[in-house]
């Protein structure tokens, strides 16, 4: 059974959990070779299955709201992506504006969680959680 945990953006545990993934060429390729980043303003939602990390969704806290960007799900698993989405929504609550920069092929999963499209690019869609 997959569980999700939250880890602050500069906690030592975060690096221990996700370093093998974010430094993996296949994972970087899935992120269009864009590096993953973190600061104290990030909270990472990490999906773990049998002691293995199977996905993560970093959420950056800004003045204007929170932003999901540069997430990863092993094997492009929609159930894991949906689970991470649910964990983020539960933790963030309805009072905070939530945005997401989503890969086009994941747009439907985010729509199932109440996100609406704001802007579309070639590979990504900017979405906002509908209030």
Predicted region positions:
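Short amphipathic alpha-helix that is part of the acyltransferase structural core
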Residues: 1-30
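Active-site rim helix/loop that mediates acceptor-substrate recognition in acyltransferases
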Residues: 23-48
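Conserved beta-strand in the GNAT
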Residues: 46, 51-60, 67
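Active-site beta-strand termini and strand-to-loop segments that position acidic
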Residues: 48-50, 126-130
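Conserved acetyl-CoA binding element of GNAT-fold acetyltransferases
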Residues: 60-76
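Conserved acetyl-CoA-binding loop-helix of GNAT-fold acetyltransferases
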Residues: 76-93
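Conserved GNAT acetyl-CoA-binding A-motif
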Residues: 91-104
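Conserved active-site alpha-helix within GNAT-family acetyltransferase domains
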Residues: 103-122
């Amino acid at each position: 059974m997959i569980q999700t945990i939250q880890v602050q953006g500069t906690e030592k545990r975060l690096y221990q959990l996700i370093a093998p993934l974010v430094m993996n060429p296949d994972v970087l390729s899935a992120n269009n070779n864009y590096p993953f980043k973190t600061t104290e303003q990030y909270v990472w939602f990490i999906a773990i299955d049998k002691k293995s990390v199977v996905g993560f969704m970093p959420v950056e806290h800004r003045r204007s709201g929170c932003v999901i960007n540069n997430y990863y799900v092993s094997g492009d698993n929609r159930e894991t992506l949906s689970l991470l989405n649910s964990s983020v929504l539960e933790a963030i609550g309805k009072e905070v504006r939530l945005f997401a920069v989503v890969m086009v092929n994941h747009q439907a999963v985010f729509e199932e969680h109440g996100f609406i499209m704001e802007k579309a690019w070639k590979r990504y869609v900017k979405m906002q959680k509908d209030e």
